[in-house]
Amino acid sequence: MNVNQQLKAKLNRAFKLTYDLVLHLDETCLNLDLPNLPSNRIAGQLWCIVGARESYTKAIEMGEWKGFSCSLATPKIKKSVLVTLEETDKKLNEIDFMGLTDVQIDLAFNLLEHEIQHHGQLVRLCK
């Protein structure tokens, strides 16, 4: 497995971890604040994750950053979040990572970093 394939595998694993977390949360938890952290509510965190996935995936496809946008209009509704997480996972997996340029690889690493940073914030739920 080359580096590009490893990067895609790590993105897939990070995406699955996010999905699994949301799957196991009660919908009421989406309105909770993260303890001892000046941050968005969990729904806001998930909106940011989805927006980053959509925006970075588009940037990877286009070979350059095209700005941030998020289609998740209802981040407090668990089913909507799960469906959108599934859609962004599918979209990422449609990209052939073997032929990526250095710029595209950097964008993919930025997406991975963003997802993992949110994991670091969301794990505070478990305290």
Protein language model annotation of sequence segments:
Residues 3-8, 75-78:
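Active-site rim elements
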Residues 58-92:
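Helix-adjacent hinge/juxtasegments
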Residues 28, 86-101:
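Acidic catalytic patch
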Residues 26, 33, 93-96, 126:
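A structural signal for long alpha-helical coiled-coils and helix-turn connectors
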Residues 8-12, 16-19, 30-68, 101-127:
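Short, contiguous alpha-helical
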Residues 2, 19-29:
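His/Met- and acidic-residue-enriched segments that coordinate or traffic transition-metal cofactors
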